């Protein structure tokens, strides 16, 4: 493999204008496959979720999953698309072992949704409108394991093993129109688009859209043209770019690579390229077949889908608030700045914070726990916030205990630690660990008296009016009560007993 | 009249992974050309008022509830596989050495 020469990003942009096309595949969260009743549950035994339909055995007849169609329509509507009055499936014919039928059931010239747009917000707040060409229904392929080569790669493998559990899982492919006019911000637009699309898909409830689990995958098509030229250059298609950061890096790398090839007088080959996470580069894959080589034809085993207009309108009415608008509303409600909102979003904490406030906690408290103690724990244990064994209602309960003065922050952290360790709900942890703030005035008073007696020199300073010295006595009381005292009340008692004014 | 050339037949044979000898290409190109010609006559009688059809029955929206049905067992699924390994279908090398 030769090292590809790149030109600097700035130089590339000085000479050329990038045009992008983004293709995103979303695996739907249906219980069953697109055309048969096999389960879609992940991580099951190899080839335990197949049947004659998804294995392509002779005589098997596919029937379309109604939730698959409904999800496709919802996605189309949320992307401001027109919904086809009538459309068909088509066979895309190709031989590759990941597709046992030797064709993929897809849609060709009659997608269920077409002609829409998605507004995305860039980091500086600018709104960029990405035009949507189409969204169509199709099915996923099986999973290959390559044996005998280095680190499981297909290159150098002696043979491959196929698990068809994934073959036939519903996919929606969403294709943009050529994205022009983004200039130097093309990679940022690509990332923002995929991020917004992911939020939208999650808000619609049609998929969890976890990119790290392959539930959402992006292909980045990119070409350059000299400034001032209308005609598009030849594009490359970088496949399976599977994180937001990678989408941005892949676009940037291809801009630099294309510019290097073009400015040295070379020509771009229309090919698929593979993205490498390690260094953000891409390498050549196969030369792209011409579309007609797939010999698409209408699928004879499935009847057309003709979504009734009243069904479409009913689905439109049920669409959730757009993620971008919801974020803006929450940002306002919570009184946070753009940067903090972005952190909350990146941490996957938006819905958890909302649920916690709905369970009665003030938003600043909900944010504080999810973005502080809980984010730290999630980070340390390599889990997502939503995977932590604590519910928003439990976080709200902890906040309520703090607000009522039953817990201080230190104790609240211990309660959360207990809940995460599976010791029960917050009240149970408080009970079992004996974590209540010492509010028994008698006990507190005794502890304060002891602290004063044990620190006579400091007590004298306070009596002499050096109120700041009270901190040391508060510390002593907190230590004596193992942190279970209300520090503010302790301070009051100390000053009172020593006749000093707070 | 639409037709099909010997080169197109060779191309389609390659896409369909069919190994055809020279004389077979000549033979099939002629036959396929005749068949396409015969089918093309349909469009001579089909006027604007006859929409193209891909299905003989006037059916739409045949859908299935999203309910799990039993799958084959892995052993059943693999029973027709020429080769298997680790409960998976074993296939020959996908990419040649390059």
From Swiss-Prot, chain B:
<dbReference type="GO" id="GO:0050567">
    <property type="term" value="F:glutaminyl-tRNA synthase (glutamine-hydrolyzing) activity"/>
</dbReference>
<dbReference type="InterPro" id="IPR036113">
    <property type="entry name" value="Asp/Glu-ADT_sf_sub_c"/>
</dbReference>
<dbReference type="GO" id="GO:0005524">
    <property type="term" value="F:ATP binding"/>
</dbReference>
<comment type="subunit">
    <text>Heterotrimer of A, B and C subunits.</text>
</comment>
<keyword id="KW-0547">Nucleotide-binding</keyword>
<dbReference type="GO" id="GO:0070681">
    <property type="term" value="P:glutaminyl-tRNAGln biosynthesis via transamidation"/>
</dbReference>
<dbReference type="GO" id="GO:0006450">
    <property type="term" value="P:regulation of translational fidelity"/>
</dbReference>
<feature type="region of interest" description="Disordered">
    <location>
        <begin position="75"/>
        <end position="98"/>
    </location>
</feature>
<keyword id="KW-0067">ATP-binding</keyword>
<protein>
    <recommendedName>
        <fullName>Aspartyl/glutamyl-tRNA(Asn/Gln) amidotransferase subunit C</fullName>
        <ecNumber>6.3.5.-</ecNumber>
    </recommendedName>
</protein>
<keyword id="KW-0648">Protein biosynthesis</keyword>
<dbReference type="GO" id="GO:0006412">
    <property type="term" value="P:translation"/>
</dbReference>
<dbReference type="InterPro" id="IPR003837">
    <property type="entry name" value="GatC"/>
</dbReference>
<keyword id="KW-0436">Ligase</keyword>
<dbReference type="Pfam" id="PF02686">
    <property type="entry name" value="GatC"/>
</dbReference>
<comment type="similarity">
    <text>Belongs to the GatC family.</text>
</comment>
<dbReference type="GO" id="GO:0050566">
    <property type="term" value="F:asparaginyl-tRNA synthase (glutamine-hydrolyzing) activity"/>
</dbReference>
<comment type="function">
    <text>Allows the formation of correctly charged Asn-tRNA(Asn) or Gln-tRNA(Gln) through the transamidation of misacylated Asp-tRNA(Asn) or Glu-tRNA(Gln) in organisms which lack either or both of asparaginyl-tRNA or glutaminyl-tRNA synthetases. The reaction takes place in the presence of glutamine and ATP through an activated phospho-Asp-tRNA(Asn) or phospho-Glu-tRNA(Gln).</text>
</comment>
């Amino acid at each position: 493999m030769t090292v590809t020469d790149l030109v600097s990003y700035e130089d590339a942009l000085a000479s050329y204008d990038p045009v992008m096309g983004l293709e995103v595949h979303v695996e739907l969260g249906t219980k069953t496959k697109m055309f048969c009743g096999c389960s879609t549950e992940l991580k099951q035994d190899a080839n335990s979720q197949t049947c004659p339909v998804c294995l392509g055995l002779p005589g098997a007849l596919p029937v379309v999953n109604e939730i698959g169609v409904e999800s496709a329509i919802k996605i189309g509507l949320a992307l401001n698309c027109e919904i086809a009055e009538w459309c068909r499936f088509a066979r895309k014919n190709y031989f590759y072992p990941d597709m046992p039928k030797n064709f993929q059931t897809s849609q060709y010239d009659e997608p269920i949704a077409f002609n829409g747009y998605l507004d995305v917000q860039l980091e500086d707040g600018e709104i960029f409108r990405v035009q949507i060409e189409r969204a169509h229904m199709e099915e996923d392929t099986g999973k290959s394991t390559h044996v005998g080569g280095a680190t499981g790669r297909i290159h150098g493998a002696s043979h491959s093993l196929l698990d068809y559990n994934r073959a036939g899982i519903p996919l929606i492919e969403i294709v943009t129109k050529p994205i022009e006019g983004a200039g130097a911000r093309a990679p940022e637009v690509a990332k923002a688009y995929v991020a917004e699309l992911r939020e939208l898909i999650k808000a619609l409830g049609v998929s969890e859209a976890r990119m790290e689990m392959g539930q959402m995958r992006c292909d980045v098509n990119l070409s350059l043209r000299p400034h001032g030229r209308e005609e598009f250059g030849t594009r490359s298609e970088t496949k399976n770019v599977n994180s937001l950061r990678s989408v941005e890096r892949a676009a940037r790398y291809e801009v630099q690579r294309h510019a290097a090839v073009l400015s040295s007088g070379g020509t771009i080959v229309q090919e698929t390229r593979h993205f490498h996470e390690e260094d953000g580069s891409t390498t050549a894959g196969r030369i792209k077949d011409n579309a007609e080589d797939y010999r698409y034809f209408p699928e004879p085993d499935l009847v057309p889908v003709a979504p009734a207009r009243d069904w479409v309108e009913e689905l439109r009415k049920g669409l959730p608030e757009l993620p971008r608008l919801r974020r803006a509303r929450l940002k306002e409600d919570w009184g946070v700045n753009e940067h903090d909102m972005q952190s909350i979003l990146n941490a996957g904490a938006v819905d958890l914070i909302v649920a916690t406030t709905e369970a009665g906690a003030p938003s600043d408290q909900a944010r504080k726990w999810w973005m502080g103690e809980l984010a730290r724990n999630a980070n340390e244990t390599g889990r997502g916030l939503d995977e932590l064994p604590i519910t928003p209602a439990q976080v709200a309960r902890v906040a309520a205990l703090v607000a009522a003065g039953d817990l201080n922050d230190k104790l609240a952290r211990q309660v959360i630690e207990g809940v995460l360790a599976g010791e029960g709900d917050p009240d149970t942890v408080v009970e079992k660990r004996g974590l209540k703030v010492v509010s028994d005035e008698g006990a507190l008073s005794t502890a304060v008296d002891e602290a004063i007696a044990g620190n006579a020199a400091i007590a004298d300073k306070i009596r002499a009016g050096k109120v700041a010295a009270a901190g040391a006595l508060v510390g002593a009381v907190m230590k004596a009560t193992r942190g279970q005292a209300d520090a503010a009340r302790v301070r009051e008692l100390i000053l009172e007993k020593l006749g000093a004014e707070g | 009249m639409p037709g099909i050339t010997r080169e197109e037949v060779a191309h389609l044979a390659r896409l369909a992974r069919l190994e055809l000898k020279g004389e077979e290409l000549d033979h099939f190109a002629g036959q396929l050309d005749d068949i396409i010609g015969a089918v093309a006559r349909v469009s001579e009688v089909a006027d604007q008022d006859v929409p193209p059809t891909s299905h003989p029955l006037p059916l739409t929206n045949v859908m299935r509830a999203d309910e799990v049905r039993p799958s084959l067992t892995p052993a059943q699924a693999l029973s027709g596989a020429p080769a298997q390994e680790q409960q998976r279908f074993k296939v020959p090398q996908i990419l040649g050495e390059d």
